[in-house]
């Protein structure tokens, strides 16, 4: 069978991944899937004759699927090893990180815990907001794919782990919800800082609790919807 990379990712990002692989000089077929059932179908049909790469997906790859692959699967994390878990850009902005980037690592049953096989980093621009940082992280991730393209396309050979470990606390949905909640007496400067870190979207916004009621910040105008750092549509109001 021909070499195949199965890309578990939103459809909007397939083209970017394929471009990065070509830029890195790799010749390999890329088959996009965006659901667990579609991935399981590929596993049955190909019986391990492919490499799985996941990016910007909320699909949880179960242990029995990973075990059936015949070799390591890889996840492209949109943040550096210092920011494992959800929404790394938000926490990096909130904490004033000096640099950011992307990480390619082996997948296992626990999120962002597998061996790291590739890193791309860049300096954080001053005053950057979440949408801009997510776009830079996407570009970083595609640079990393291009750099490792030939190794990714060599399906039978696992990528060599780097002597780098994950650090920092793995952020969860609960942590992000706490970041989104602002105190009633927040200063204008602190509000602007938190807004830069969190941004706005169809599924999240800054919130505040007043007199026992929770209020949600309404977006200004038609905010764009972003998938993995790439603008895809305007949010419906």
Regions found by a protein language model. Name each.
Residues 1-237:
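One-carbon transfer enzymes
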